[in-house]
């Protein structure tokens, strides 16, 4: 019974979160594009709901990277999907170690033939930051990684602190070669 109540409360929270997100997008003029394909094995988007999780599974997603501070889903929901939660407050840059952890997780999953979905709340700042971290790990410059993602997700908006941290990551990888 308690499990059922918890499930209903989480579900209600997700519905409210989804409604808020859509209202915010309409007011701010941000498109409602839920996900963008960055590479053959990497998708970037906003927080998904339970229906969206089924769509991700249908796309072949084998791993999820969540950049939100909240973790709305328990492990049972992600049955069969690897899950990395890297809690990062909105409009802030994740620590360098977090970018390295996320980029390595994405790279490892893709090398195994997996498909990764990266998200934050709206897919504007934190999600694109970790996706760019992966592309930088592959050898792209920050500018090239940004251009690649912006080509398919025009409304990304990394904060100045996130850009600075990504440039630090680029320097880290170029010094470790």
Question: What is each model feature region?
Answer:
Residues 27-115, 136-168:
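Cysteine-based protein phosphatase catalytic domain of the PTP/DSP
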Residues 7-9, 71, 129, 168:
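Sequence-pattern detector for short linear motifs
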Residues 1-27:
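Non-catalytic regulatory/accessory regions that flank a structured catalytic core
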């Amino acid at each position: 019974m308690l499990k059922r109540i918890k499930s209903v409360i989480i579900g209600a929270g997700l519905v409210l979160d989804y409604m808020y997100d859509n209202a915010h997008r309409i007011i701010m003029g941000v498109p409602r594009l839920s996900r963008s394909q960055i590479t053959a094995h990497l998708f970037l988007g906003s927080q998904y709901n339970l229906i969206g999780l089924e769509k991700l599974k249908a796309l072949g997603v084998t791993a999820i990277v969540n950049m939100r501070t909240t973790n709305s889903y328990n492990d049972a929901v992600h049955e069969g999907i690897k899950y990395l939660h890297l809690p990062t407050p909105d409009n802030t840059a994740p620590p360098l170690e977090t970018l390295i952890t996320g980029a390595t997780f994405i790279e490892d999953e893709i090398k195994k033939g997996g498909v990764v979905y990266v998200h934050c709340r709206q897919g504007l700042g934190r999600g694109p930051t970790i996706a760019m971290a992966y592309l930088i790990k592959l050898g792209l410059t920050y500018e090239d990684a940004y251009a690649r993602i912006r080509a398919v997700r025009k409304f990304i908006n990394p904060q100045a602190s996130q850009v600075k941290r990504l440039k630090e990551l680029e320097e880290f990888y170029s010094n470790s070669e």
